[in-house]
A protein has these predicted regions:
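Cytosol/matrix-facing amphipathic helices and coiled-coil assembly/linker segments
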Residues: 1-26, 82-165
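Internal alpha-helical transmembrane segments
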Residues: 2-81
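The feature identifies polytopic integral membrane transport proteins across all domains of life
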Residues: 22-33, 56-64, 124, 156-163, ...
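Transmembrane alpha-helical segments and their cytosolic interface motifs
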Residues: 26-42, 152-178
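Structural signature of hydrophobic alpha-helical transmembrane segments
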Residues: 186-198
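Interfacial loop-to-transmembrane junctions
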Residues: 202-229
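Juxtamembrane boundary at the C-terminal end of a transmembrane helix
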Residues: 235-245
C-alpha cells in the first residue's frame, strides 16, 4: 500500500526533474498495465454489451475473466522481459570485467573516445576516465552504461515489474467492470464507459507530468484511444448480435 501510494504521488505530484530516472523501471509497466487494463476490458465489456441478447451475467463473467487473464498475462510478460534484460546486463558486466582485466589500456582509450565524442576536450576526458578507472566496479558500471546503454538503476526488478503491471492492469480493468457489479442496463453501460474515459483522461494527465507534455493533450489522447476501441467493439458486438438473431 505504501509503495502504491508513493507511486501515485510520483505520478500526480510535482513534475519530476527531466534527468530523474529513478523508478523508471517500474513506471513503464505500471502505466502500460493500467492503460491496457482500462482499454482492453472496456472493449471486451462493450463488445458483449453490444449484442442485444447479452445476459448481464455474461457481461460480468467476461469482465472478470478479462481482468484475471489480462493481469496474469501482463505479469508473466513483464517478468520474462525484465528478467531477460537483467540476464543480459549480468552477462555484459562479467564480459566487461574480463576486458578490463586483460586489456585495460584499450578499454581506457574507448571510454576516452566516448566522452570526447560527446564534446568534452580530450584532456578533460582523459582526466575523467583516469578517475573512473581507479575504481574497478565504477569503471565496469560506466562502460556498460556508456557502451551498451544498460543500467540497473533504470531497469527495475523482474518481480517488481510483474507485480506492478498485474496490479495496474487489474485496477484498470476493474473500472469498467464495477458498474455492472452494482447496476444493470443503460445506467451500468453509461457509467462503465464514462468512468473508463475519465480514468484514461486522468492517467494521461498524470503521465504528462513526467514526460513534460501538455496535460490536456495527453489526457484527451488517452481517452480518445479508449473511446475508439470501445466504439468499434460495441459496433462489432451489435452487428454480430443482430446477425445471430
Amino acid at each position: 500500500m505504501i509503495a502504491a501510494w508513493s507511486h501515485l504521488r510520483s505520478v500526480f505530484g510535482p513534475p519530476a526533474s527531466p534527468h530523474d530516472t529513478r523508478g523508471s523501471g517500474i513506471l513503464r509497466p505500471t502505466v502500460f498495465g493500467a492503460s491496457d487494463g482500462l482499454v482492453s476490458n472496456v472493449s471486451l465489456i462493450m463488445g458483449i454489451a453490444g449484442a442485444s441478447s447479452a445476459d448481464p451475467r455474461a457481461i460480468v463473467l467476461a469482465g472478470i475473466a478479462g481482468l484475471l487473464a489480462g493481469g496474469f498475462s501482463m505479469a508473466a510478460g513483464e517478468y520474462i522481459s525484465v528478467r531477460s534484460q537483467r540476464e543480459l546486463l549480468d552477462y555484459q558486466v562479467e564480459l566487461q570485467r574480463q576486458q578490463l582485466r586483460h586489456t585495460p589500456e584499450q578499454e581506457r582509450a574507448i571510454l576516452v573516445e566516448i566522452y570526447a565524442s560527446k564534446g568534452l576536450p580530450r584532456a578533460e576526458a582523459q582526466l575523467i576516465v583516469q578517475r573512473i578507472m581507479a575504481n574497478p566496479e565504477q569503471a565496469i558500471d560506466t562502460f556498460v552504461r556508456e557502451e551498451i546503454g544498460l543500467s540497473a538503476e533504470t531497469m527495475g526488478s523482474p518481480v517488481g515489474a510483474a507485480v506492478g503491471s498485474m496490479l495496474a492492469f487489474s485496477l484498470g480493468a476493474f473500472v469498467p467492470l464495477l458498474p455492472y457489479l452494482l447496476l444493470s442496463g443503460a445506467l451500468a453501460f453509461t457509467l462503465s464507459i464514462a468512468g473508463t474515459l475519465a480514468a484514461l483522461f486522468l492517467l494521461g494527465i498524470g503521465v504528462s507530468r513526467l514526460t513534460h507534455r501538455h496535460p490536456l493533450a495527453a489526457g484527451l489522447r488517452q481517452a480518445g484511444m479508449g473511446f475508439v476501441a470501445a466504439a468499434v467493439t460495441y459496433g462489432v458486438g451489435t452487428l454480430l448480435g443482430t446477425a445471430v438473431h
